From Swiss-Prot:
Keyword Cell division recorded: no
Role noted for this protein: Component of the RavA-ViaA chaperone complex, which may act on the membrane to optimize the function of some of the respiratory chains. RavA functions as an ATPase.
Regulation: ATPase activity is stimulated by ViaA.
Binding site residues for ADP: 23, 49-54, 196
GO cellular component: cytoplasm
Family annotation (CDD domains): AAA (cd00009)
Family label: Belongs to the RavA family.
Broad class of enzyme this protein falls into: hydrolase
Entry keyword annotation includes Lipoprotein: no
Annotated protein name in UniProt: Regulatory ATPase RavA
Length: 498
């Protein structure tokens, strides 16, 4: 086997050559190339005139000396038009029922069948055998067929519960194509003078027969790690729970895994990675409704579980909760505790400051910062006399936020533990403590747990960075995964600063 990175670079250059002159068809070309390199079938859904046949025609140039066959199905199409006419000579001289297959599907490496659902039962039955077993029964003989890629196309989906479903299930990759959307691309397409039938691929990039056969064996040697299997099983279980999810046969799952192996192999990796699972969005849908549903479920899998994003957030939540518990315990120990006075006949409970608090101006620290009067507040300065009067008689209390400016009106109360608590407009509270009595920084236990979590996050981010160099995965999906990881990292860093 060539060096993995050299192979990945070669396949990337091969795909770029095939994409020349085709606008907004890069993803389709790349997946069709992946299908061709792994011996799978593709279904293209879309209106007429959007280069479906040209995509299939281009794929012929990925291989040296590949033969292509294309045919437009109608309700009147006959097996002779697809699989070759009967040999009159063989029937006349030897009484043999044999087809002349030269130039027809049984001898083609690349096959394109347009309006596939209009094919009759005789064609469909033979086609199923060709796809499944890569064999063609020609009279009394069973011949191996060299087909590497079958591209079937239509502007409609097969009817449910029809005889076409068996063939549809064999189409592993399903792509929904539309007209060129971007203005600049549309103009370039209109003014392009490129001959669509020219070979755009240098001979040095084309795949030889020997390479193709060798790669088929090496693709099967790509491993499926346990954590990737768990993600696949999680997706399968989730789809089984959804009432509107499409039925996915065991055969389709197995063929999809080989496609993931091929994606890893041609990306220079020895094992399937979570990023390869994005390809399942083009393998598991059945119709428009299930297309959206599958994409949503895979998006959840990629941005929530594939790189342990949700697991890390769960751990972070537990750490933050533990930190709050420690803060509460510390608050109970260090908070300023006022003295409850007697007064059975008083209309309100009265309090006084501890005797050791004698300063004329008291600076009290918030156990946790609050936003008060549009300011992030960490401490409040009170006039001792004003605070004593409020403790004794109630009414309005004011203090200088962070010790600056004019004294501002505060929502202050004494809780059941006789601690002073200040609240913001959303009624979130923070206990007040004297300077020197409040613990500074994160507790060692919390700091260590956050450092371990950040280390695990960095490992996952490095893994993603190494795996995202995959030709067959659209960039917008990679962007969403990166954003999900960055969000987790930001939340960890925010917790470290508390």
């Amino acid at each position: 086997m060539a060096h993995p990175h050299l192979l990945a670079e070669r396949i990337s250059r091969l795909s770029s050559s095939l994409e020349k002159g085709l606008y907004e068809r890069s993803h389709a070309i790349r997946l069709c190339l992946l299908a061709a390199l792994s011996g799978e079938s593709v279904f293209l859904l879309g209106p007429p005139g959007i280069a479906k046949s040209l995509i299939a025609r281009r794929l012929k140039f990925a291989f040296q000396n590949a033969r292509a066959f294309e045919y437009l199905m109608t309700r009147f199409s006959t097996p002779e038009e697809v699989f070759g006419p009967l040999s009159i000579q063989a029937l006349k001289d030897e009484g043999r029922y044999e087809r002349l297959t030269s130039g027809y599907l049984p001898e083609a490496e690349i096959v394109f069948l347009d309006e596939i659902w209009k094919a009759g039962p005789a064609i469909l039955n033979t086609l199923l055998t060709a796809i499944n077993e890569r064999q063609f029964r020609n009279g009394a003989h069973v011949e191996k067929i060299p087909m590497r890629l079958l591209v079937a196309a239509s502007n409609e989906l097969p009817e449910a519960d029809s005889s076409l479903e068996a063939l549809y299930d064999r189409m592993l990759i399903r792509l929904w194509l539309d007209k060129v959307q971007d203005k600049a691309n549309f103009r370039s397409m209109l003014t392009s003078q490129q001959d669509e039938n020219d070979n755009p691929v240098p001979a040095s990039l084309q795949v030889t027969d020997e390479e193709y056969e060798r790669w088929q064996k090496e693709i099967g040697e790509i491993t499926l790690p346990d954590h990737v299997f768990e993600l696949i099983f999680m997706l399968r279980q989730q789809l089984d729970k959804l009432p509107d999810a499409p039925y996915v046969s065991d055969r389709r799952w197995k063929k999809a895994i080989r496609l993931l192996q091929a994606s890893a192999f041609f990306s220079g990796r020895s094992a399937v990675a979570p990023v390869d699972l994005i390809l399942l969005k083009d393998c598991l849908w059945y119709d428009a409704q299930s297309l959206n549903l599958i994409q949503q479920q895979i998006d959840v899998l990629m941005t929530g579980h594939a790189w342990q994003q949700q697991g890390m957030l769960t751990r972070l939540g537990a750490i933050v909760q533990r930190h709050l518990q420690l803060q509460q315990q510390q608050s109970d120990k260090t908070a300023l505790t006022v003295i409850r006075l007697g007064g059975i006949f008083s209309r309100r409970q009265q309090y006084q400051l501890p005797v050791n608090v004698t300063a004329s101006t008291l600076t009290l620290l918030l156990q946790k910062p609050l936003k008060l009067h549009d300011m992030e507040v960490v401490h409040i300065s009170f006039e001792r006399n004003a605070l004593e009067q409020w403790l004794s008689k109630g009414g309005e209390i004011r203090g200088k936020l962070n010790g600056i400016g004019f004294a501002q009106k505060l929502n202050l109360e004494v809780d059941s533990a006789q601690h002073l608590v200040v609240r913001d407009v959303s009624l979130q509270g923070s206990t007040l403590a004297l300077p020197g009595s409040s613990a500074e920084g994160l507790p060692g236990e919390i700091k260590q747990q956050l450092e371990e979590l950040e280390s695990d996050w960095r490992k996952q981010h490095v893994l993603f960075s190494e795996q995202q160099k995959c030709l067959f995965i659209p960039g917008d999906w990679l962007g969403r995964i990166e954003a999900s990881l960055q969000d987790v990292g930001a939340q960890i860093r925010q917790a470290q600063q508390c």
